[in-house]
Amino acid sequence: MNDALPSTDQGAAGPLIPVLAVVGVGLIGGSFAAALRRAGQVGRVLGVGRNAASLARAVELGLIDEAVSAEDAAARADLVLLSTPVGGLKNVLSRMLPHLDAATVVTDAGSTKAEVVDAAREALGERVGCFVPGHPIAGAERTGPEAADAKLYAGRTVILTPLAENSAASINQVRRAWQACGASVIDMDAGAHDRVLASVSHLPHLLSSVYMEQVATAADARTRLDLAGSGFRDFTRIAAGSPEMWRDIFLSNRDAMLAELADVRAVLDRAERAIADGDDVTLLALLDTAAQARRNWRKE
């Protein structure tokens, strides 16, 4: 964990979030708690998770003050962040529902939004207005509480996909929490979010993982890996992420993923034909377009 020491700069009015509950105290949830502590905008932090040892470690690291059940978190927290694999959100919300305080706001950090919104509606019913869907565009291949970084969200973008049932106050509370972490916050439609993220986040991870699996299972895998250099390292870095989390993301965003796979397969087929035919003009044009686009990309 980096820079997770608590700050005391809360101001006369006290912290923005008196009691925060984080469900899933790993890279995303742990960094959220650490960033709010660093900003002096959280009072007490409750941690919820499946692994008692991991929660105990989160307490040792100062990410959370105590480990509690999902039900207890729902009853006590002013804001709940769900940072678990998206496939498990419906179950967590169903457990929380009978215990949710009327003023409690719930948000998530899931990488897909349309299916998460559907799950929230099914789980929460008429209380769905307390759930403000969100997605921080930040992450790393590291996992667990040790991966938490108070600066993870500084300068990053967080996308909210508010529901018609959300109150302005609930949306603003989530927005201000992410801003306190150093992030810029924008709003998007859930479907548009999923289509864009399938292209620039989900598909790259799948391609990295598929390539890594192909190399790792080859008959001469040991030789290949021994000779691999920086290009291999850079391309496969994200394949080291949580398999459970990414499985859920791919399946949750199935339609958009299939559309993106069809598009990238068409380009791959074009490149394969150019190589097979010795078509240097087509191959050079493809590589030049890619190189120029990457060089002109505004972020690093």
Where are the language model's segments positioned?
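Rossmann-like NAD(P)-binding element
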Residues: 70-107
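NAD(P)+-binding Rossmann beta1-loop-alpha1 motif at the extreme N-terminus of oxidoreductases
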Residues: 2-75
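Short secondary-structure boundary/capping segments
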Residues: 12, 71-72, 98, 123, ...
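Interdomain hinge/lid region at the active-site interface
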Residues: 221-290
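Conserved short alpha-helix immediately C-terminal to the canonical SAM/SAH-binding motif I
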Residues: 53-54, 88, 113-116
